[in-house]
Amino acid sequence: MQLSDFNYELPAALIAQHPLANRTDSRLLEVKADGLNHALLLDRQFKDILSLVKPGDLLVFNNTKVIPARLHGKKETGGIVELLIERISGEKQTWVQIRASKVLKTGSIVHIHNHAGETFSVEIIGYDGRFYEVSFPDNVFSLLERFGELPLPPYIEHQPDGEDAQRYQTVVAKNPGAVAAPTAGLHFDEAILQKIKNLGVNQATVTLHVGAGTFTPVREEDLSKHKMHYEWFSIPNETLQAIEATKENGGRVIAVGTTSLRALESQAASGQSGGETNLFITPGYQFKTVDCLLTNFHLPKSTLLMLVSAFAGMDHIRAAYQHAIEQKYRFFSYGDAMFLCRLENTKP
């Protein structure tokens, strides 16, 4: 499997820079198999999710909460640096991406500042070739609240503002730790969640803290050589029980977003209900838990595009993305959504 198999051309005008006025105003592309190995593509509104779910189905949300994970600072030499938390590994330790003119050495000190003129210092204690291990002087979360900035994705070109502070979080966000939102969940508001519940559709949660590695480009053309980044996840017992009951009663497990799917499939593969996962899903992967997937449109050559291609079929996804571009769907984090079911679970 080659990286170039997952490339496509996207007009920049289709990259959503701001959220729509209401969460549920987005469009929804339903991708179905027609029995002839072709994709049947249905243009819908997100509110039509109410007609796509069925009594007895289980919607699984990622309840991670985006933290203010971007920090600005200076090296001891005065050079400007930017830190982006990749994942938090302890009360006072993190792995981070650092944007600087040169690679920082172990033992280097970086002085972090905020707009109020306050400062604190961190020490570089390790480097694995991609991410730096950094020691903080105090609790990481408390320092991020005072010094951090909301880490909007690199393709969103404006500085974070009050709108982003509200709309780049899902309404189910509960557990702080993500540096990017689980974007499929951004389409839901409290009202539509209640309507779904009234239909007899159950809801459950997992936690997977989306790391900065989700935006790191895949550099290996041969995908078998790609090293997937790690992300921390946890699945409560009540969610595992809900999945088991759903399967026994003939319902479908519907993952809201690729992060929910990765958490569920990581548990199914390892038997562990929590920990760090570097599960890399590409075409040929045998899914064990998730039947249907609600997801946004993903970047070219990204591991998330590979995941949805594995889930719904490469030809179906190529056709769906081409259709979405022609119909001017909005792409990426603040964009529109797709509803996919696994090929063996999709009926004509």
Curated annotation (Swiss-Prot):
Signal peptide location: none
Role according to the record: Transfers and isomerizes the ribose moiety from AdoMet to the 7-aminomethyl group of 7-deazaguanine (preQ1-tRNA) to give epoxyqueuosine (oQ-tRNA).
HAMAP family reported for this sequence: QueA
Molecular function GO labels: S-adenosylmethionine:tRNA ribosyltransferase-isomerase activity
GO biological process terms on file: queuosine biosynthetic process; tRNA wobble guanine modification
E.C. designation(s): 2.4.99.17
The protein's enzyme class: transferase
KW 4Fe-4S (keyword) present: no
Pathway: tRNA modification; tRNA-queuosine biosynthesis
Protein name in UniProt: S-adenosylmethionine:tRNA ribosyltransferase-isomerase
Domain of life, per lineage: Bacteria
Cellular-component GO terms for this entry: cytoplasm
Binding partners and assembly: Monomer.
Gene3D superfamilies listed in its UniProt record: QueA-like
Compartments in which it is found: Cytoplasm
